[in-house]
Amino acid sequence: VVEDTPYTVEDIRQRFGNDVAGLVNVVTKQKKEIYQTTKQVDNYQQILASLHYDIRAVMVKISDRLHNMRTLQSMRPDKQMKIAGETDCFYAPLANRLGLFEVKSDLENLSFKYRCELEYGDIERWLQQDEADNRERLQRFCKNVKGTLKDHGIQCNVETFWRRPYSIWRRMKQQDVD
């Protein structure tokens, strides 16, 4: 990591290229801003390094984190916050970069549940209250779309998805909605 050497990120970029410099920069920022203990930094560096040798090791680590997040309720609140923060900052983005979009979404939602308990609860209640009505309307809409396209000789498959609490919260924040 660059703070432990006389080299800068730019030196690394010139010698090894943008990809390596970008990785070094990310690890350096994480070390400075997020992970305070050497043990944590070493652990995350080992995870990133294992990407080069065997992706299965990273998959096991991400799976383990997902399991830990699903059973986090048994831990003290301070540990919940710490683990949820690590998950949000490291594991969810890593899962996303590896194309594990459903896992990323699960990690984000579980992290959100512990980091923003009130907001998560409000959104979850709102989703459950309107779920039956929304499902019925969405099914009618999809049926109409498929019928109209079929009438015009177009075969299609219409799929739907439900936004999850973290995604809704993030969108609300982006649009400055309470």
Residue ranges and their predicted role:
Residues V1-V177:
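Active-site helical microenvironments for divalent-metal-assisted chemistry
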